[in-house]
């Protein structure tokens, strides 16, 4: 499995199609702020088959209280360090392959800080994600992300905060 950084309009259109077709509980491909996306390919097939996409973007503001507590920051300190946090804004797989989910997250943890620094000039120290209500975050737990709390959630469901950090 390989991650390919999304750069071209054709790749951006592919991300849009994957999200709209395979991510039904939040089917929008739009986001606000910074954003870096990758397409996920099976490197064991020729030609390589696209297995999904994953993306990070600007973190959330205001921050959830559990996140502030976990990282030991005030809201003001978080604001000062905002560009060191990224939100795993979307993760869509189009196929079910054993262990693929945690393999993708491992690659994301490797590539995200490099690309974040390259594109934005900031050191990425924290990746955060929100797991939709009714889901248990098993793929994140398999990659050793920690559940740090629950948010009030979107109007239709609660979500759990999970994070991975480089410390």
Per-segment meaning from a language model:
Residues 47-51:
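Glycine-rich acetyl-CoA-binding "A-motif" of GNAT/NAT acetyltransferases
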Residues 1-34, 39-41:
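Short amphipathic alpha-helix that is part of the acyltransferase structural core
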Residues 43, 53-166:
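Acyl-donor binding region in acyl/amide transferases
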């Amino acid at each position: 499995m390989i991650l390919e950084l999304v750069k071209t309009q054709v790749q951006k259109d592919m991300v849009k199609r994957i999200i709209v077709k395979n991510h039904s509980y939040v089917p929008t491909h739009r986001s606000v702020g910074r954003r870096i996306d990758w397409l996920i390919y099976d490197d064991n097939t020729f030609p390589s088959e696209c297995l999904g996409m994953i993306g990070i973007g600007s973190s959330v503001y205001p921050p959830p209280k559990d996140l502030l507590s976990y990282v030991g920051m005030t809201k003001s300190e978080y604001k000062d360090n905002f560009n060191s946090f990224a939100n795993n804004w979307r993760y869509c797989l189009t196929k079910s392959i054993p262990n693929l989910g945690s393999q993708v997250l491992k690659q994301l943890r490797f590539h995200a800080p490099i690309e974040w620094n390259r594109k934005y000039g900031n050191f990425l120290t924290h990746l955060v994600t929100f797991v939709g209500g009714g889901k248990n975050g098993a793929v994140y737990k398999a990659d050793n992300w920690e559940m740090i709390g629950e948010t009030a959630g979107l109007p239709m469901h609660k979500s759990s905060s999970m994070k991975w950090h480089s410390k």
